[in-house]
Amino acid sequence: AAIYSSEIYFDDIEEVQLLDELPDDDFVRINGGATDEYLIGHFKSSTYGKCELYVYADSYPIIMIKTRDEVIFMNTKDSDDTYSIFESIHS
């Protein structure tokens, strides 16, 4: 399994949203993994440009974090954990 991490400073966050699902976009994997279970690593999107995805495919919601340089989509297998992460970033 691929192992990736990302460090985001609160001061770099321009926007954070809680999404019901991953946007319907053409995400092209640059480096990382894409299986039926997860999307993880570096991707390029026609709408968002350079992206990092840390997404479990059948788990919702999804957090979208926009910084000046990139967009990060992430979630956890447990929706309560994802909501908790969103609240800690959003507040």
Predicted regions and their residues:
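Non-transmembrane, membrane-adjacent beta-strand/coil modules in membrane-associated proteins
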Residues: 2-7, 15-66
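Terminal and domain-flanking low-complexity segments
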Residues: 22, 56-91
